[in-house]
Amino acid sequence: RVIGFKEIEKSAGGNRDISRVVQSFPGVASTAAYRNDLVVRGGGPSENRFFLDGVEIPNINHFSTQGASGGPVGIINPDFVREVNFYSAAFPAARGNALSSVLDFKLQDGNPEKSSARAVLGASEIAFSANGPLGKKTTYLVSVRRSYLQFLFELIGLPFLPTFTDAQFKIKHQFDRHNELSVLGLGAIDDMKLNTDMKDMSDENKYILEYLPVVKQKTYTLGAVYKHFAGHNIYSLIGSTSYMDNRNVKYKGNIEEPENLSLKYRSGESEFKLRSENLFHLPFVHITAGGNLEYARYTNDTYQKLYTNTPVVQDYRTALGLMKWGLYATAVYESYNERFTASLGLRADANDYSNEMNNLINQLSPRLSLSYRLYKDIYLNGNAGRFYELPPYTTLGFKNNKDEYVNQTNGLRYIRSDQAGAGVEFRPASYLKFTAEGFYKHYNHYPMSVLDSVPLASKGADFGVLGNEAVTSTASGRAYGLELMGRWYNYKGLTFIASYTWVRSEYKDGRNPDKYLPSAWDNKYLFTFSGTYSLPRNWDIGAKFRLVGPAPYTPYDIEKSSLVEAWDAKGNLYYDYSRFNSERLEPFSQLDIRVDKTYSFRKWMLTIYLDIQNAMKSTYNEPDVYIKTGNIVNPEAPASQQRYELKAVKRSSGTLLPSIGIMIDL
């Protein structure tokens, strides 16, 4: 599926953020408010991969969850995006390490004739971008953004105040008609403070401040893409380096004294990647073949107070080096009358982490997709494949207090997913399409937490870190469903997409090895309508309505949580995993509205927009939580048996959020 620039630019409630726009497509669920986690076809947020002009980007969000992919705000500036190819199945063999989706961003080239610029005062940031020529054969794109999200969050009464800065560039040089080189970069600096000075603080905000750490992140990716065009052959060489520095600090009661320190976490992820690829165009057949070589370095310095049945301090340091390699090939056949298309791909990956992972044959990944035009504008489509994903570095590099790579000893393996899908597509016009598709995904060797016997697949949609714990590759799961979509694209001023998904997502945990239980993404059903319409005199209106089915949740273990030693270690409640996802929330709906007006002048344009998120003031009711009052109900008991008095707190989210934005094009 292809997402155009206008769908990103004018999307209601999207705040010009590609992750929010993708949530309009079938099979894509949304999670908690103020986050951009991609949950595709019942898979977790850690199962997605992102590419920018062929260069892999480890994450596309500010304040991202390390080990997953979500965060509250996107990094990529939409001003430079030409289109996005979104794959929710049948992933290209050249795009490995994905189980749920691949987002392949295609950037514009700079204008070779003249320079232009854009300034944006948006709902959460101020931005400046420019593009143009750098000589006869070179063009450039550059942008810088700075947020004032902390003011918005303070205005609506949130207990955390994030600030971010990001920059992006692309330089393309055309040596001659046979050779070109593109150099691109993307970087972000994130800083989150706790809003501890709030007046008349609600109990819900007290609860969040009790456990939420201070987060600081730095990320960047630099890449170069060389292409050689030789008749029917295109050769590509892609090199890149990425880095992430993630720091979390938490003090008990947010009082910064050494004895109150409960979490001090610093982790770094460095990647160096090289990929070589050849594309051959033959009569009726296109063949792509290539290979990749990568080196990753993961470091971690962790001090964390935990509680199992007694207080425990986790204290370890990691410096893990990992060499990865892979091979892939794809053949695409299209019949002479364009009635039948087939794509057959094969991929294999390996690394030197352990004997379970160092053999390419063990991660052999075939995939096949077919399309047949049954009658005029009716197409039958099908796909099947086996896909592998490497567990996150946080899991690979986890150590116990004995300085042992415990997950290496536990036989950690690649996660495997066998997938199949079939559907029908009706294209009555070039701008109109209807689709119906059923899918099935089966998971094997998913990491399962040793501590709580829950698959990592049901984690990762919150701030913090995913996977930094002892696991075994013993969890299995499945996701299946039916997707319906109607799409009208950019005809007579109208663009819209309407989608409905019936989906089930289930896993077996360590307590119920013979029974499937709902995963955290088992919403049962999803409905989304999103559209924009261009009116006379440069007016545009847009709306987005989404309905999310009843998400499952795990009740809290109040008996354990009330223990003073347990609460002081975590500053939060503990789940009762013996009742894993046994309860469900109410369904949730939200309506967003947007209006744009553009004024054209002789040498510049002015666009003003009004965006209203949650126009119906819908309330998303979350499970009740508890906060400590500070009183110990049994002070005479031994320290290990003393309990806090806990107070119940109602939780809900759903603020009507209007915002005005201004864009100036020069």
Language model features with spans:
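Transmembrane beta-strands of outer-membrane beta-barrel pores
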Residues: 88-90, 107-109, 121-125, 146-150, ...
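C-terminal beta-signal and adjacent terminal beta-strands/loops
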Residues: 444, 546-570, 586-590, 597-666
